[in-house]
Amino acid sequence: SDVYKRQEFDTDHINILFNNAGIAGGGAFVNMVRTEWDRCFDVCFYGVFYGCNAFMPMLLASDEGYIVNTSSVNGFWASVGPDVSHTAYSAAKFAVKGFTEALITDLRLNAPHVKCSVVMPGHIGTSIALNTSQVLGKGGAMDMSSEEVAFMRSRYSEAGLPVDNLPDDDIRKMVLQVQED
């Protein structure tokens, strides 16, 4: 809501709000780095939560409003694959799904002119893992962790590329090539 309070808008209401926030990382629970776990939750869950909170006054001021929150297929199934641990990401996306389902009832009872839904997209060919590494200052493609390489390998495999037997450095080079293009 601090964001909302600091902004000046040309209108006092909005009719639709899209909350789409995501960052890879956080990784495993067993050997987590707390700051990475927190950052994953801060973006993936709290990005959606604070988006709703910041713009709720403008939605309430409208004749009718709609909120669309983006979770992930990993908010249904907590797995990218058997060799990739991403507990923080899945937990955050489950939280978005649960928050949205609870918000639907909350709005129905307290603001029936505002509706809400959650979108659960499947794996989409983005560079979320790589972009996250760069945002966190972990370097480029050649510095990708084995977890990030496994994630990108699964993405390439899903796209139909025969990458199962490629060495990890070849996967890193493929990602680097995509970055440079």
Model-inferred region functions:
Residues 78, 83-95, 99:
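The catalytic Tyr-X3-Lys active-site helix of short-chain dehydrogenase/reductase
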Residues 28-29, 36-38:
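Substrate-binding pocket helix/loop in short-chain dehydrogenase/reductase
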Residues 72:
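Residue(s) in the substrate-gating loop at a strand-loop-helix junction
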Residues 2-4:
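Short, small-residue-biased leader/transition segments that mark boundaries at the very start
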Residues 52-53:
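A short, exposed helix-loop element centered on a Lys and neighboring polar residues
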Residues 109-181:
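SDR active-site lid
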Residues 20-25:
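Conserved NAD(P)H cofactor-binding loop of Rossmann-fold oxidoreductase domains
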